[in-house]
Amino acid sequence: MSDVGPDLYAGLERAAKVATLLVASDLDGALAEFTLDPRDTTPAPGGMEALRRLAALPATHVVVVSGRDVRTLRQLTGVGSADPILLIGSHGGESSDPTVTVGAPLDRGQKALLDELSEQVAELVEHHPGARLERKHAAVTVHTRGLSEDSAAATLAEAELLGSDRAEVRVISGKSVVELSVSSADKGTALAALARHVDADATFYCGDDVTDEDAFRALDPLTGDVTVKVGSGPTAAAHRVGSVSDVVAALEQLLALREAAVRAS
């Protein structure tokens, strides 16, 4: 038994024994604590190490799934092109491995729309000191972490309005963030496609925000999948942990169980 709790431990124990296992996690809020500046994000000690060791085991596939673009994910996680860990960026719109297709590339119209949205968001941020803009592969994001509650609410409401009347723009509201995406890709579709690609018998996934709910709904605990919500709030996940350090503990426990299963096989 471990400190992850008996129900989650039982799920990890079952998943560790399957023939082919897919291990996936969000970055921000799951593998890494939030920072005022999203460029300063650093994975918590132990998490990436556990993922690398899992990826080195037979029939064990590891992926980080994030709203960040793949280029930024490489910088923040330290995962290189020769690394066995796959990176899925832009909520499922990008893959670090060209042989793994999880989303369609942006067309000319989508790229032009993204440029237009970026200009509009840049103007918005100028009028709200402390708000930050992040340009991604298929989206532009407004971050308000660190702002007063009233200032953050006003900024995010204005950001939502920029895309609310445009059918081709997906407005994603999360924790201290609003993202305007020109892609319909989501983490659930990407994770399901990846599970089929590797022929996974079970998938582990943990995440903390609204976009992770797509992944939770795409997986099925009744067939052996393990879904873990980080933090409070309503969720479709079967399990819940309270913090990033709890995610690291769960990954380390899964690693120990998977290593034991490999030795016993």
Set out the residue ranges of the language-model regions.
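Mg2+-dependent phosphoryl-transfer enzymes with acidic/Ser/Thr/Gly-rich catalytic loops
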Residues: 1-6, 18, 183, 188-265
